[in-house]
Amino acid sequence: MSASSTAGQAGLSYRDAGVDIDAGDALVDRIKPFAKRTMREGVMAGIGGFGALFELSKKYQEPVLVSGTDGVGTKLKLAFQLNRHDTVGQDLVAMSVNDILVQGAEPLFFLDYFACGKLDVDTAATVIQGIARGCELAGCALIGGETAEMPTMYPDGEYDLAGFAVGAVEKKKIIDGTTITPGDVVLGLASSGAHSNGYSLVRKIIEVAKPDLDADFHGQRLQDAIMAPTRIYVKPLLSLIETLPVKGMAHITGGGLTENVPRVLPQNTTAVLQRDAWALPPLFQWLQSQGRVADDEMHRVFNCGIGMVVIVAKEDAERAIRHLQAAGEAVWEIGEIRERAEGQAQTVVV
């Protein structure tokens, strides 16, 4: 195009294309104090550089790095609908740090990816403040991230999230389930709600039942129960691991109880869970009744009140329960490990 064809016209800018660099800079300034509160030993350089640096502690003799990545799923659609963005950041952190925790890893640092069509600084800052809160609960550093403003890629007011956690475990202390044997005890730690899984079904139930999400629900608004942030189990379980032998752990996420517990079991074993060992929390009772959801479907979609499973030897069970209760966790003995019969499922709820 010749210079004369644009005479008298202002040149185009990135802002004209839908990307506001100034808003991105303002967001970085807003979130730096949040990230600073998460800093821990090992962080050499955090937010602002091209790459974040982390020095692994010399306390490890044979360190093994453990990584995990996840998102928040369609729980975000409810966040948009309700215009509340204060809990999904913690959800994002929890999904990854709880995953790497089950192998005995201490989460060291976390990075986030926030993508949107048009950047709303207040919304993004609220989300990232929640991410920082989750990192504090997990004891890991929010060491970096990416904010991607991509015009026309997302509807106005919507965004997507992804998170990445890296932790470390001593090689000889990796928890992989290989020592699990028949007779071991299955403990269940309470969830805070539906956590971050099954929300496509939650949203469908809401669509069909048309409840008042601001109505009182056992002392809180129904929307508060539905949007409760995912519980982070890192500190109490790292403490337990240092106290007694933990044979296996399972983070109860997508797939519920019946599809996550088998992921840590030897092929010749099955976990038999007693459905009356813990009370089904009110939120799940409501979801089941409003959606007329079958028991088996509940167990393979939702955590049903159990956010983390811990497997220990029978002789260690009572001590483990006392330790976790002292750390503030609600915990129950919910089942046992048995020898697996031919053709039997690896986890059954009876």
Swiss-Prot record:
Pathway: Purine metabolism; IMP biosynthesis via de novo pathway; 5-amino-1-(5-phospho-D-ribosyl)imidazole from N(2)-formyl-N(1)-(5-phospho-D-ribosyl)glycinamide: step 2/2. GO terms for molecular function: ATP binding; phosphoribosylamine-glycine ligase activity; phosphoribosylformylglycinamidine cyclo-ligase activity. This is Phosphoribosylformylglycinamidine cyclo-ligase. It is found in: Cytoplasm. One of its GO terms (biological process) is 'de novo' IMP biosynthetic process. It is an enzyme of class 6 (ligase). HAMAP family: AIRS. Belongs to the AIR synthase family. It holds the Pfam family AIRS_C. Its EC number is 6.3.3.1. GO terms for cellular component: cytosol. Keywords: ATP-binding, Cytoplasm, Ligase, Nucleotide-binding, Purine biosynthesis. It comes from Cupriavidus pinatubonensis (strain JMP 134 / LMG 1197) (Cupriavidus necator (strain JMP 134)).
